[in-house]
């Protein structure tokens, strides 16, 4: 019977040296103890030949249950961690039971406290023991110290301390702190946070370094217009994060096709103003449509950070539109509008995934105001939204779903105030900003397959619907295609081939568009 029990427990029979043999015997003895054979021992060991060792064990009485007396564990009893005077459990569950008690103490802030079993005795197959405790003072997080990046933004550090200081300290709090720091795209955590327990304080040390959080994508070319004048063409997309070590962000976007459209957009955001949860964001956007019209929009917003990735903004927006050709018609004329806006934003980064650094993003913005044109004065309301999520079926198969929507309510519409869309960041297969609408909704779907840690391919299936009441036109949109993404030391390269068509229009290869981008990180 004892031999059958021994054979049921796995052990290695081949070893590289005598020391490994002794280690295996000790490990096997420990296995016997965990299975209830506390009095097991080696009663004979012999060397059969130069390479064979034989050990004979006596198992003794097996312990099936443990009976734990809790009367000496007053703190555990007072806090309802144990409620009975005597607890009887299977002996194999002893380690799990003790670990659960330690976990419950740790969750309550008693990280340096301990429990143990003493005064052992046996009664046939039952082991009896007393549960004793060593309870130290509850731990609270007293300070957060940043090492490695001495110029870490003061506002961000203060808000971290404000959120976590004096909280009951446990592993969950440490994990939440780590996750919150991961949301700062401008820093890397060199290693996991470390804890320093002193007699009267608990400190957490963060080991940080400034990351390459800036991106640039673009090219510049030259061409001639119909009058043989040289014009610039190309685009530039620049994002600067934490350039001044205050956590600020600057975005600059410029695009010109040399003929029909020119776009200039500049945005800056200053977070944690005066080390408070408030932020300031400003934006200037200039859009010119050939020789038809030019729009100049300015936005100023005061933001509040509930936490770093959840924000709300109150803002004021104004736009001036010039009818360049002085058409002065109901559908195209000079106007000005002003809106008071409310925005909500949420994002969840995925810093460990180089190919898809953001898992979730959701933005919604609404505004109410009025438009004054050469013909009328209209009250207006708008709402715009964009949201996406990466659904990980597993590490290699990912479904990316994105929704975009826009609605402008007005008694009348002017062409130059309509929402413009189409292109790589919207319905793919259409020229950038070639579509316009007062109502638009679109769903963009991708099936992504990761070929390697730095390479993936994906399908493209985009659906959209829009209404253009200024032109009395509405239609459905379809974009189909495929693409790939490649992460290099320099940045992320994307190639997209997409074909766009409208409802009732035959899909033609001649309508296909290739989108290429390379975001360099520095």
Regions found by a protein language model. Name each.
Residues 149, 354-356, 455:
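A generic short alpha-helical patch detector that favors 3-5-residue windows
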Residues 36, 60, 109, 136, ...:
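Glycine-centered flexibility sites
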Residues 237, 252, 265-267, 360-522:
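C-terminal transmembrane beta-barrel domains of outer membrane proteins
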Residues 170-363, 391-393, 420-424, 433-437, ...:
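Gram-negative/organellar outer-membrane beta-barrel architecture
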């Amino acid at each position: 019977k004892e031999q059958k029990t021994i054979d049921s427990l796995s052990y290695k029979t081949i070893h590289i040296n005598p020391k490994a043999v002794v280690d295996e015997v000790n490990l096997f003895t420990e296995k016997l103890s965990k299975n209830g054979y506390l009095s097991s021992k080696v009663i004979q060991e012999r060397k059969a030949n130069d390479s064979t060792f034989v050990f004979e064990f006596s198992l003794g009485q097996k312990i099936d249950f443990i009976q734990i007396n809790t009367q000496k564990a007053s703190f555990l009893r007072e806090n309802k961690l144990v409620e009975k005077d005597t607890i009887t459990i299977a002996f194999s569950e002893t380690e799990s039971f003790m670990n659960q008690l330690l976990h419950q103490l740790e969750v309550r802030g008693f990280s340096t406290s301990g429990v143990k079993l003493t005064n052992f005795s046996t009664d046939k197959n039952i082991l009896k023991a007393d549960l004793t405790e060593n309870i130290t003072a509850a731990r609270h997080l007293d300070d957060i110290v940043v090492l490695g990046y001495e110029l870490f933004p003061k506002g961000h550090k203060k808000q971290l301390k404000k959120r976590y200081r004096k909280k009951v300290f446990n592993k969950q709090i440490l994990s939440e702190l780590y996750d919150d720091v991961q949301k700062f795209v401008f820093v890397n955590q060199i290693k996991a946070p470390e804890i320093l327990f002193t007699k009267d304080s608990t400190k957490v040390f963060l080991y940080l370094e400034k990351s390459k959080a800036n991106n640039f994508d673009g090219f510049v070319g030259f061409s001639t217009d119909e009058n043989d004048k040289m014009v610039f063409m190309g685009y530039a997309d620049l994002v600067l994060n934490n350039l001044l070590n205050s956590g600020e962000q600057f975005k600059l976007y410029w695009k010109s096709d040399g003929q029909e459209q020119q776009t200039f957009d500049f945005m800056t955001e200053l977070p944690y103003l005066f080390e408070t949860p408030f932020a300031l964001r400003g934006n200037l956007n200039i859009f010119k449509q050939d020789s038809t019209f030019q729009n100049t929009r300015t936005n100023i917003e005061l933001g509040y950070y509930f936490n770093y990735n959840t924000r709300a903004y109150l803002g004021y927006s104004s736009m001036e539109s010039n009818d360049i050709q002085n058409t002065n018609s109901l559908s195209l004329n000079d106007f000005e509008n002003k809106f008071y806006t409310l925005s909500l934003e949420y994002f969840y980064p995925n810093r460990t995934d180089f190919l898809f650094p953001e898992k979730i993003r959701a933005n919604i913005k609404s505004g109410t105001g009025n438009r004054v044109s050469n013909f009328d004065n209209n009250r207006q309301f708008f709402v715009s939204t964009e949201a996406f999520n990466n659904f990980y079926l597993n590490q290699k198969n990912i479904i990316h779903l994105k929704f975009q929507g826009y609605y402008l309510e007005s008694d009348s519409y002017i062409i130059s105030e309509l929402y413009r869309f189409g292109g790589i960041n919207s319905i793919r297969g259409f020229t950038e900003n070639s579509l316009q609408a007062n109502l638009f909704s679109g769903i963009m779907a991708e099936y992504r397959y990761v070929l390697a840690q730095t390479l993936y391919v994906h399908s493209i299936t985009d659906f959209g619907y829009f209404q253009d009441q200024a032109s009395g036109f509405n239609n459905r949109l379809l974009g189909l295609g495929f693409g790939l993404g490649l992460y290099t030391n320099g940045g992320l390269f994307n190639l997209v081939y997409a074909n766009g068509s409208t409802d009732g229009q035959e899909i033609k290869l001649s309508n296909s568009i290739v989108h290429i981008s390379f975001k360099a990180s520095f």
